[in-house]
């Protein structure tokens, strides 16, 4: 089908939705929510289409001036300059923006996200690094006015985290954080190291889209739920009631333990939320592999075994190995969560890969 017809169809659809939303009393709550979502998704695309249409009209008008034998010489020359800039420079730029805007969206991009961090190789130093990463993402969430809600933290007693998870709520959380999944490596001299020897440790980060029960249902028969008394560092009991919950998904043998809340009901709800996100992510990855068999994405795999970034403290340097980007602002990134330098490039690179795959 002609691309021009597609663009005009989109404009007509947008205008139709706009008219509908002008009289919300005629809509059910579900219709209003769905139309509002579609309207907000279409609005940036329509803005580019309007820009494209305006530019094409301006180019045609300039063509008329250039062809008109009655046009004065100076006006013709100015028109030729403007025509060249708009035809050869601006139009290709707007076309590229339009092509990108029309690419199929990742349906999970608008979702909230569950952050999971696990200490890897490196013992206590790895646990301290995991805690540092957890705080870094918390700072980044604050910078973007997202809500950062810790779900579960398994600490080592001296400030490190063996495991930690959090729910992050806000606008396009998953879209911006999904490329953070993978192995993060740190190189630094531990405070306890008397010889000053450089240690290398690692932590694994997983970013999972949050899914509601209506979006992804888990069969009750596939679950085993055990309750017990919660324990603190070293195994000592910190609760006199059976509030800790262990949920096992029998088909996959996946286990989620939640004991941070005093209420068994709240712990169960949180554990099920994490389990649902993990199972959904497995299905999502299967679909992504099917979609990308024809093209090998360098940054979009989200493979948790892939080493994606190294934090070198002696040189105050952070390197993202997927995009060969190095920053010497380690302090600001770690302590203030200034991650956008990396995230923006990762998003742009992914968009370029998707465009190449469509062409």
From Swiss-Prot:
Chain positions with N5-methylglutamine modification: 236
Gene3D superfamilies named in the record: 3.30.160.20, 3.30.70.1660, 6.10.140.1950
GO MF entries: translation release factor activity, codon specific
PROSITE patterns, per the entry: RF_PROK_I
SUPFAM superfamilies: Release factor
Family: Belongs to the prokaryotic/mitochondrial release factor family.
Lineage: Bacteria, Pseudomonadati, Pseudomonadota, Alphaproteobacteria, Rickettsiales
PTM statement from Swiss-Prot or TrEMBL: Methylated by PrmC. Methylation increases the termination efficiency of RF1.
InterPro entries noted in UniProt: PCRF, Pep_chain_release_fac_I, Pep_chain_release_fac_I_sf, Prokaryotic/Mito_RF, RF-1
Key words of the record: Cytoplasm, Methylation, Protein biosynthesis
Stored PANTHER family: LD18447P
S-S bonds: none
Protein name per its UniProtKB record: Peptide chain release factor 1
Protein encoded by which gene: prfA
One Pfam family it belongs to: PCRF
Organism listed in the record: Wolbachia sp. subsp. Brugia malayi (strain TRS)
Keyword Protein biosynthesis: yes
């Amino acid at each position: 089908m002609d691309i021009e017809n597609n663009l005009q169809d989109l404009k007509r659809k947008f205008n139709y939705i706009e008219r509908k939303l002008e009289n919300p009393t005629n809509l059910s709550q579900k219709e209003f929510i769905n139309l509002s979502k579609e309207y907000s998704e279409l609005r940036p695309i329509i803005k580019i289409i309007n820009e494209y249409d305006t530019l094409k009209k301006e180019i045609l008008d300039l063509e008329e001036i250039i062809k008109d034998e009655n046009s004065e010489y100076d006006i013709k020359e100015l028109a030729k300059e403007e025509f060249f800039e708009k035809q050869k420079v601006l139009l290709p730029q707007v076309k590229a923006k339009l092509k990108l805007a029309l690419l199929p969206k990742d349906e999970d991009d608008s979702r909230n996200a569950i952050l999971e961090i696990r200490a890897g190789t490196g013992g206590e130093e790895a646990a301290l690094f995991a805690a540092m990463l957890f705080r870094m993402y918390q700072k980044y969430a604050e910078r973007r006015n997202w809500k950062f809600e810790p779900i579960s933290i398994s600490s080592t007693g001296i400030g490190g985290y063996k495991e930690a998870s959090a729910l992050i709520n806000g606008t396009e959380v998953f879209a911006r954080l999904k490329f953070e999944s993978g192995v993060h490596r740190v190189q630094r001299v531990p405070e306890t190291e008397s010889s000053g020897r450089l240690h290398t440790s690692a932590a694994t980060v997983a970013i999972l889209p949050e899914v509601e029960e209506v979006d992804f249902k888990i069969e009750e028969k596939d679950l085993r739920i055990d309750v017990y008394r919660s324990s603190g560092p070293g195994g000592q009991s910190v609760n006199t009631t059976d509030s800790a919950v262990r949920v096992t998904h029998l088909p996959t043998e996946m286990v989620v333990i939640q004991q941070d809340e005093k209420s068994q009901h709240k712990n169960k709800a949180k554990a099920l939320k994490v389990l649902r996100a993990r199972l959904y992510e497995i299905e999502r990855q299967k679909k992504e592999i099917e979609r990308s068999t024809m093209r090998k994405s360098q940054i979009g795999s989200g493979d948790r075994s892939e080493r994606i970034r190294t934090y070198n403290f002696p040189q105050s340097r952070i390197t993202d190995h997927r995009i060969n980007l190095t920053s010497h602002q380690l302090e600001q990134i770690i302590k203030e969560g200034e991650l956008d330098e990396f995230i923006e490039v990762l998003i742009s690179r992914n968009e370029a890969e998707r465009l190449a795959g469509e062409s």
